[in-house]
Amino acid sequence: AFWCGGDTEQMDRLFRKSGLMRSKWNRVQSGSTYGALTLKKAVAQAMDFYRPYARTSAESDFDDMLQKLIELNVSDNSRYPWNDNGSGRLFADAYKDIARYVPERKKWYVYDGTRWIPDIGGLKTMELAKSLADSLVRYALTITDERRRKDYLEYSAKWQSRNYRNTYISDAQSVYPIAMSEFDCNIYYLNCQNGTLDLQTGEFHPHTPQDKLTKIAGAAYDPNAKNPRFTRFVAEVMSGDADKARFMQKSLGYGLTGDTRYECMFFYYGATTRNGKGTLMESTLHVMGDYGLTVRPETIAAKPSANSQNPTEDIARLAGVRFANISEPRRGLVLNEAQIKSMTGNDTLNARFLHENSFDFKPQFKLYVNTNYLPAITDMTLFSSGRVVIIPFDRHFEEWEQEQNLKAEFSRPEAASAILNWLIEGYTLLQEEGFAQPKAVKDATMSYQHDSDKME
């Protein structure tokens, strides 16, 4: 009664699977059965009930784990001796589909139903351990041999100890370790709020841990979603230049994937304020969700030589990111050309977080800088190699033209799905047409190159 929380149905189900089951359990007695009366009496006499740690869908979760433990035959399986090593292997085997240790991060990654996330502080892993401890008690009750059952109940009781859980969780780290590079490998999978979209094939499938995705977009995929106001907004900020608007749509759609073949960065440049680029960028970042990241301008700024032993968190945070936004760098910022070449050149990057190990990753991110001031460039090869692309925002919205609620409007779920469709359309156009620059983009980029050349 204690371990089942007074749930007579669960008590009956477990008792029938145990070695204590006898035929008299089903004997009719006093208008009921011997078993039902026994359970009722046990619940009535119970002074307290066990309160499981995992309350959500507890019965289903316990039943699923109980069945897994039975299939693994954990009490008699030589893989799981009744010690720290065996307990570590059991934890790793029980949760290998949803919990894996990442040595570079010195953390477990846990699947939350939509994506794999780092278990900061080990809290989610500890909850899994508590749930497994609860299931082991129920498993012990299914053992038919009385002596064996008693011994295994004593062993499973150890799992309720925090110190013991910490020990076997630590032992489990080495069983199925996974490298950072094994996550987010499919650069065309876009993990949406309601499933995963393959941007190459158009196929849409439910979330699954087997995809090994650590990011999720901020929008649900609805192929029928439309937002005429956003379409009109794009035309407005591009001053009615359809070719420039089409190119901008392709540049933003490019950010949906992890494909970096074009090896360039985009400057959304407007010398005047109130030109719409901030609203456009924030709306896109909202749709991108985890795939988008706001990056400090200092990340691309020239600076004194840094100690290679120092953490490179600005770069480490870009692992798995596809849309990196740098907003409004200061006037007079000097671009770190070597850093830009590294970040846009498809080379493997190495980075580390504070107090963690370093790791390598292939960049999937594209750089988008929205600014009123273009940074100083001294290395003209950034232009000759096509790494710098300027998309001009020439429109200035007067006060009477401004819509104060536009950002809120575009962040609504229905609008976010429509903007996602617009981005997908942009990526489709990019595949079909390539990145040929319209006159406005060519002229703006050439002007920037000319001004930079004079400064050299």
At which residue positions do the language-model features occur?
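Feature primarily recognizes SF3-like P-loop helicase cores of small DNA viruses
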Residues: 62-107, 134-456
